[in-house]
Amino acid sequence: MKESILSDLLNRRLSLLGANLDLLKQCLHGIERECLRVTDDGRLAQTPHPEALGSALTNEQITTDYSESLLEFITPALADPAKVLDSLEEIHRFVYTKLGGEYLWSPSMPCALPAEEDIPIAEYGSSNIGKLKHVYRKGLALRYGRTMQCIAGIHYNFSLPEALWPLLRDAEGGEQNDRDYQSSAYIALIRNFRRYSWLLMYLFGASPTLDKGFLRGRPHQLEELDEQTLYLPYATSLRMSDLGYQSNAQAGLTPCYNNLASYTDSLRKAVGTPYPPYVEVGTHKDGEWVQLNTNILQIENEYYSNIRPKRVTYTGERPIQALMSRGVQYVEVRCLDINPFLPVGIDLPEARFLDAFLLFCALEESPQLDNGECGQCTDNFLTVVKEGRRPGLELRRDGQPVALKAWATELIERIGQLAGLLDRAHGGNAHAKALETQQAKVDDPELTPSAQVLARMTEHDETFVQFSLRQSRLHAEAFREQPLPAERQQAYETLARESLAEQSRLEQQEVGDFDLFVGAYQASILAISN
């Protein structure tokens, strides 16, 4: 009975969209790809961020994440995912003209890492905002260790057209204003994402193995594949498993996705609530900043989640402030592994499937999550990342066991309705084909990227590092053989130069003491009231 009621709402919304197909051409997509710079023997590059790539502080397309050696490439948000991937490929091709003898590491799990203290923390110059970004990263090192921060991923940003929400609200007799209805709809999408994201880990998880040194001798439940490689035989994404690391400070922080206000409120409390072990350390050691504050979270982005509600921020504005004042604008999917077989880590069929999947999450009925269902969602996710390919694996739905294969097949069939609409809107059958590709992985687990990684390593008798370096070299060769057209190369050169000039300007115009700047930044969050 429940399924038919839920399908009724989905069917009504599908009919409405079917009459407004043009709206589906206005969804926006953006991709962020992180990757380590490595030496030609597969070790972490300890060179500074190449100046030829511009300023990591002000270049909007090429920056660094945690480490000076961890690059992040950011595409613009565009309506056509094919153009987004073209942009991501262009960035890779440009970067390879500036890397010298270094490589971009192909998988999510890191290369052989140096001693913890030798992993360089990203530098952003002498402006107050640049220093703040550096101190925040020092705080992450203090709290979670540097090693964990070297894991890379793909972030997929997605928004539905703003004109869609009033249509849905009016058809359903809703009374919220445009902004609040839109925010509620995105939070509902996130609840459904929590319910169904285990499917993404099965289909796209690509990290069943890792370098033994990554665990630094910590206790673990992994098995030895060879002397230098740890793995789990049925794992899809060790990157998204706990790997024996727990954040005790964040353990009690489970933002409620029942509405935007409860979500922002829980994060606001966390960035304003001291955590005794951090208080004990303090913010300074030997006169140097070691963390921005001693609270559960230094800033909102420290909260680790698989998906985030987002709003583009104004200069100097904090993410929570933007969400509270203007509502949710898009979602950022953060649980995707980099596929080491793909030059940019993701391809068009994956993007097309993600679009249909996220559209399904947005339009399917999304009841509130109680504590029991919340725990069930987390358990299903963790089960799939550790043993998603185990034959006969069962998950839990409504408290009852259900075979992963049966549930995945049912979900893909339902997502197929959205793929059909997207194909009608865009012409062709690319979305339906993307779904067929994913269903084939459900039917045959050997087709999943995680199984392919293990098969390739076994076939070549390679360690994790050897396999990853071979893939990195293959991709490097492909990029270097395809230089950008001169005008595109020039455009990226200009972007890099302008970003360096912008950083220099910021540093020259800087007024005010850094301690006061941090104090004001901290106070900005405490001053917000609902």
From Swiss-Prot:
Presence of keyword rRNA-binding: no
Name this polypeptide is given: Glutamate--cysteine ligase
HAMAP family hit by this protein: Glu_cys_ligase
Pathway(s) per entry: Sulfur metabolism; glutathione biosynthesis; glutathione from L-cysteine and L-glutamate: step 1/2
Keyword Ligase: yes
Native organism taxonomy: Bacteria, Pseudomonadati, Pseudomonadota, Gammaproteobacteria, Pseudomonadales
InterPro entries: Gln_synth/guanido_kin_cat_dom, Glu_cys_ligase, Glut_cys_ligase
Record GO biological process: glutathione biosynthetic process
EC number: 6.3.2.2
Enzyme class, spelled out: ligase
